[in-house]
């Protein structure tokens, strides 16, 4: 996979343009914008302090959390689609990756963003859409079995690069593998709680 990353034909100028566009789109903090617009205050002051959909759900507004999830996914998809249309497939992959980075480390709010699950899915939708079906299937299977949302996402993110590699899509597999590693790092507190048996389950109160 690493050798495939080195064999890309994209020029430095196009790669930089794709990265900047992707990052700026990914940096839009929809969770924060929506909760403030709804009069629910600063989502960073509750729960985990995260701007993602899971923390928005802690406000008690399910519709707002769903909207956050959708918009956080679509900003990565939009980055890949727009850049891909004008600059090509490799640029689309780069744009999706940097939209993911932008969500995790948004320039507008001090580089403190989400954990990247929604933008991971959005990037998949933009560059390898059939893989979204696999992600959803794995997530659902693990969630039904364990009732851990975080574990479901972690397992799904582990499966995706392997599946892409098996299917011969090595460029996307390599990038998604890097995104998986980064998201695992962002989920390190969840992983610690999972190992300690203290992670909250889906539907748990308090």
From Swiss-Prot:
GO cellular component term of the entry, any: plasma membrane
Transmembrane segments: 14-34, 67-87, 91-111, 124-144, 148-168
GO MF annotation terms: acyl-phosphate glycerol-3-phosphate acyltransferase activity
UniProt main location, coarse: membrane
A Gene Ontology BP annotation from the UniProt entry: phospholipid biosynthetic process
Subcellular location, record wording: Cell inner membrane
Record keywords, A-Z: Cell inner membrane, Cell membrane, Lipid biosynthesis, Lipid metabolism, Membrane, Phospholipid biosynthesis, Phospholipid metabolism, Transferase, Transmembrane, Transmembrane helix
EC numbers on record: 2.3.1.275
Superkingdom, natural source: Bacteria
Pathway membership: Lipid metabolism; phospholipid metabolism
UniProt membrane topology term: Multi-pass membrane protein
One Pfam short name: G3P_acyltransf
Reaction(s) catalysed by this chain's protein: an acyl phosphate + sn-glycerol 3-phosphate = a 1-acyl-sn-glycero-3-phosphate + phosphate
Function: Catalyzes the transfer of an acyl group from acyl-phosphate (acyl-PO(4)) to glycerol-3-phosphate (G3P) to form lysophosphatidic acid (LPA). This enzyme utilizes acyl-phosphate as fatty acyl donor, but not acyl-CoA or acyl-ACP.
Subunit and interaction comment: Probably interacts with PlsX.
Family label: Belongs to the PlsY family.
Matching PANTHER family: GLYCEROL-3-PHOSPHATE ACYLTRANSFERASE-RELATED, INNER MEMBRANE PROTEIN YGIH
The name this protein goes by in its record: Glycerol-3-phosphate acyltransferase
Species name: Rhizobium etli (strain ATCC 51251 / DSM 11541 / JCM 21823 / NBRC 15573 / CFN 42)
